Regions:
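Sec-dependent N-terminal signal peptides
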Residues: 7-10
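Formylglycine-dependent sulfatase
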Residues: 2-5, 15-422, 430-471
């Protein structure tokens, strides 16, 4: 029933638009930039003039969330429109499943050309990898298996290449060259640009580090990386204007999770790795001159799983016939200025799993040596369903956001299998300091409804995790 409902929901926008009328899409994502790590959100030191300008001219989301509290799962949510636990992407270093349908695959069927640039972190850099960018719908890719630093190695469609320069600028230059070729063909495009900044280790080039000469060395490098990324965003915006495609290009910027210890949460509770606001609320801005004529700020809830259905609706493309259950919802009404409240609650779930470390340069250097020797190894299997998960035990920290209210379900450390609950009103208490649960009878019905909704959603996620969506 849920899948049929989704298909009916999109039927009204499924009429395919002529190619010339379809917007282009650029999805930019920072790596570990917290909610408070921008000038426009009040950082007292950090210089982000381009992001500040975007926040003044575009649509600024003040309640936008990463679908997970760490990187790989969030990236998987962007690609699929689904909570990452549905396809077993529990933590950093986990991959997509080959059965998933990505936004690149869906837009390719609608006539788009697709490119990925920068951090991938949800699959192999080998061309034959089941979850490589190429086997996830991208026509062209200059990608890194994880975070990357200056003068990075990239995998270009599976072949290792060298680059020279500040990491964000190198990534942007590659993307602009590719966009220029798409513009010459007059073909709508999807460019996914996932920066390596400001993930540690922090090594800013002198030009940007010098801007923070009065700060401790570590902070100067951290701030310098963000300002360098900001400047690269500026080059991207200038570049698409010069190419004449800016007016009908949707440029969507956000981060993959909340702040790291050196970063700023802007006063929100906790940091990267936590489902409290400081771990998942992230900066987010959309620019689209053809549609967003003046600055708007929205407090409507949104998250990275919404990107997939939003782009498909904007492209006038139907959902694939075999589309698995979506967690995201289209934010087109927000772009059109016609929505103030999100009707669909948002679920978040940190499933208890250890991450898998990936050292980008070492992995790509190993691949390069294999290629130079003419003895490239086959990619390892990725995204396999290796077990069945029970639906009666739902471990880990989960949250359920419905309007202004956020319910936490937290495992009790001393008593395995038991959970404690907390409730916060994000409009009045964004820092999540005042737990509203107790003897408040006025909230009893709401809490019961939220608990029921969260439990049903978790069971749905486990069914997806066990492969039900692919049968």
């Amino acid at each position: 029933m849920k899948r049929n409902f989704i298909l009916v929901l999109f039927a009204a926008v499924a009429m395919v638009k002529p190619l010339a009328e379809r917007p282009n899409f650029i999805l930019c994502m920072a790596d570990d930039q917290g909610w408070g790590d921008t000038g426009y959100n009040g950082h007292p030191i950090l210089k982000t003039p381009v992001m500040d300008e975007m926040a003044r001219s575009g649509l600024r989301f003040d309640r936008f969330y990463s679908a997970a509290a760490v990187c790989s799962p969030t990236r998987g949510s962007v690609m699929t429109g689904r909570n990452p636990n549905r396809f077993g992407c529990f933590a950093w270093g986990y991959t997509l499943r080959p059965q998933e349908i990505t936004i690149a695959e869906a837009l390719k069927k609608a006539g788009y050309t697709t490119g990925h640039f920068g951090k991938w972190h949800i699959g192999s850099m080998r061309a034959d990898g089941a979850a490589s960018p190429g086997n996830s719908g991208f026509d062209d890719w200059f990608s890194s298996p994880n975070f990357y630093e200056n003068s990075p190695l990239f995998s270009h469609n599976g072949q290792v290449i060298e680059t020279d320069g500040e990491s964000s600028h190198v990534t942007t230059a590659l993307a602009l060259d590719w966009i220029a070729n798409a513009a010459k063909r007059d073909q709508p495009f999807l460019a996914v640009i996932w920066f390596g900044n400001p993930h540690s280790p922090h090594v800013a080039v002198d030009k940007y580090k010098k801007m923070y000469a009065d700060q401790p060395d570590g902070a100067a490098h951290f701030y310098g990386e963000i300002t360098a990324m900001d400047a690269a965003l500026g080059e991207l915006r200038k570049g698409i204007r010069k190419l004449g495609v800016a007016d009908n290009t949707v440029l969507w910027y956000c981060s993959d999770n909340g702040a790291i210890p050196r970063g700023s949460t802007g006063g929100l509770r906790a940091r990267k790795g936590s489902l409290y606001e400081g771990g998942i609320r992230v900066p987010a801005i959309i620019e689209w001159p053809a549609r967003i004529k003046s600055n708007r700020i929205t407090n409507m809830n949104g998250n990275t799983s919404d990107i997939y259905p939003t782009l498909l609706e904007l492209a006038g493309a139907p959902l694939p016939k075999n589309q698995p259950v979506l967690d995201g919802t289209s934010l087109v009404p927000v772009l059109n200025g016609k929505a103030m409240r999100r009707e669909k609650p948002m679920g978040f779930w940190t499933y208890q799993a250890k991450g898998h470390g990936r050292k980008s340069r070492a992995m790509l250097e190993e691949l390069r040596q294999e290629q130079l020797a003419g003895n490239q190894k086959p990619a390892e299997p990725e995204g396999q369903i290796d077990r069945q998960y029970p639906t009666d035990t739902l471990p880990g920290h989960t949250t359920w956001i419905d309007g202004d209210y956020k319910l936490h379900r937290l495992p009790v450390k001393k008593n395995k299998g038991e959970f404690a609950y907390e409730l916060y009103h994000l409009g009045n208490d964004p820092g999540e300091q005042q737990n509203l649960l107790g003897n408040n009878e006025k909230l009893a019905k709401r809490v019961a409804r939220m608990k029921t909704g969260l439990a049903a959603w978790q069971k749905s996620v486990v069914k997806s995790l066990n492969g039900d969506d692919y049968r």
